[in-house]
Amino acid sequence: MLAGKTVLLCVSGSIAAYKIAYLASALKKLKADVHVLMTRNATNFINPITFETLTGNKCLVDTFDRNFEFSVEHVSLAKAADVVLVAPASANVIAKLAHGLADDMLATTVLACTCRKIISPAMNTRMFENPITQDNLKICEHYGMEVISPASGYLACGDTGAGKMPEPEVLLQYILKEVQYEKDLKGKKILVTAGPTREAIDPVRYITNHSTGKMGYAIAKTAALRGADVTLVSGPAEVEPPMFVNFVPVVTAKDMFEAVTSRSDEMDAVIKAAAVADYRPKFVNTEKTKKKDGDMAIELERTDDILKWLGEHKKDSQFLCGFSMETEHMLENSRAKLKKKNLDMIVANNLKVAGAGFGTDTNVVTMIRENKETELPIMSKEEVAGAILDEIFGIER
């Protein structure tokens, strides 16, 4: 995933330094070339040997270390780096970066880097909220560095508040955002729908379906990592919302209709991957329905057809993509839906095909356009997402 990419991890003195070992390991598993720089104070919290073992590269601390192959080390690393993450970033290191001080290996190297720089502050709440620290962070942002907001919680000093470094998985996502994909969708605005909806029968029960949201979330995440401005409208899904998207949670088909129709006009593309209820109970009981002898009938009524509305109101410059989950006559039914709903493309899959459908991490789909059909082999949902986005925006691989 990150083969050929060089990631520079800069670790300063903080109790959170140990978390970077997990991040370094995760990056190596993704085939990145990982280099670690440490301040002297950081070595009091974690041994450089740990990073050398995990990355296979020498961990640099001293600008004038004589035990390395001859090269101007801080310059050669700065040239090679595709992205730099300073984490944990102490108040002292942030001050150095803001004002261009270069008195150690870490600060010197970061100053020489021209690639994207990310800073993850970690310190006591009072230090973080100090106006001087806040001004320094604003200066860093002014010079193009991205600052990750610290989490709030119980701190090592015993205080509770802002100042915790986010978990390694969060830091990894920031790195992936910078280097995993080309930013070939930068400037594009995309609306994605995902997950199921729920239609209440009474305060206890509801009608829903087996959608987990995985496919829609994969599309939203991939589009965001490729630089798009993504709005994700989602029903109650079984997965965590991806980072870097505008997340709009909804519950019912009516909620989703309102959320989508109020936002669709400004979008370059709308990708409707949600499994929206076609029917809802006509009457919702205000109290729990009690079990009785004999059968019970629930009168249903149609919900608003979101995809039909989008097709009727679509701008000429807007791309509208729907999904079709079938159990039989997949191509015929999907072609009919493409035409009836005025879609530019429909992504069809058959629930009965192994590796496709709800809850899986893979999918088997056919992308259908008016004069073109592209059948994809079984792929991860992230790979399917990439193929869908390529087709929508005419990107050839």
Model region roles, listed by residue range:
Residues 1-118, 124-213, 217-397:
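A cross-family phosphate/adenosyl-ligand binding-site feature
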